Amino acid sequence: DWECLPLHSSCDNDCVCCKNHHCHCPYSNVSKLEKWLPEWAKIPDALKRCSCQRNDKDGKINTCDKYKN
């Protein structure tokens, strides 16, 4: 049975991260920002990467249905 990705792994949704982590995309607003940037100011893909981060008390938690039971 497939387990879950460890902390700091690349992810595209909460379900691939472990239950006590969530998939965090620090630059999820980058696409909006890029519209306003000059053509040469490209933001590297590495910065746009989402990764599994620890759940925290600010409500950043894993919302995947498979963990809800």
Curated annotation (Swiss-Prot):
Oxytoxin-type inhibitor cystine knot (ICK) domain ranges (all copies): 1-68
GO molecular function, one term: calcium channel regulator activity
Signal peptide: none
Superkingdom as given in the UniProt entry: Eukaryota
Compartments (UniProt record): Secreted
UniProtKB keywords: Amidation, Calcium channel impairing toxin, Disulfide bond, Ion channel impairing toxin, Knottin, Neurotoxin, Secreted, Toxin, Voltage-gated calcium channel impairing toxin
Modification type Asparagine amide: residues: N69
A Gene Ontology term for the protein's cellular component: extracellular region
InterPro entries membership: OXYTX_ICK
Domain notes: The presence of a 'disulfide through disulfide knot' structurally defines this protein as a knottin.
General function of this protein: Weak blocker of vertebrate P/Q-, N- and L-type voltage-gated calcium channels (Cav1 and Cav2). Is both paralytic and lethal when injected into lepidopteran larvae. Is not toxic to mice.
Further facts: The primary structure of the mature peptide is identical to that of omega-oxotoxin-Ot1a from Oxyopes takobius (AC P83288).
Protein name: Omega-oxotoxin-Ol1a
